[in-house]
Amino acid sequence: MKICGITREDDALLAVAMGADAVGFVFAPSKRQIAPSIARDIVRRLPPEILTVGVFRDEAPSRVIDIVNTAGLRAAQLHGHESAETSRLIRARVPLVIKAFPAGDPELDRVDDYGADAVLIDSPRPGSGEVFDWSLAEGRPDGRRVILAGGLTPGNVADAIRQVGPWGVDVASGVESDRGEPGQKDARRVKAFVEAARGALPPRAPRPVDDLDGFGPYDWMEDDAR
């Protein structure tokens, strides 16, 4: 499961401590937008097994590639109207690509063209935090790693997992504090979300990121030696 919209180091460490598999940093214009330099500093504090994801929306491929690699991220999440050609170009230059689509998007029928490692299905208004009809995500795209997003909370994530059976789930606003700065996470909500999601998994289910072992984290020692 991915805790997205991380803006503070404390929240990233909180997510990891509570059992999250991944954390996301938003580089697209948003109230949760973070500077690449700050994201890089946070990433360097995280365990290497954590999947670190940069979220972009219709950004120039060269900038996506530069931020992912210089910040030491393991994945680029393309959350806009990126073409299949753009997705493949970026995938050739970063460790992993997650391509996001609105629920019901006909492009889900040709998702193989995008060359993405995982597909994220969001509400028809991506990033709005709105819940959508989960039946739109059932069984599609077949045989792909599907990440479910859109209005998930500690109160509904278990039902979503049982109905859709996704490879992963993604949350941002559903675990945020009612007070504080934009993007600030609430420890109790993060804990409740992770516990609810884990509780909905079948016994002995592997952690979703376990099948990404071939895609290692950024090698900081190699980078520093250049």
Predicted regions and their residues:
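Conserved N-terminal beta1-alpha1 strand-loop-helix module at the mouth
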Residues: 1-226
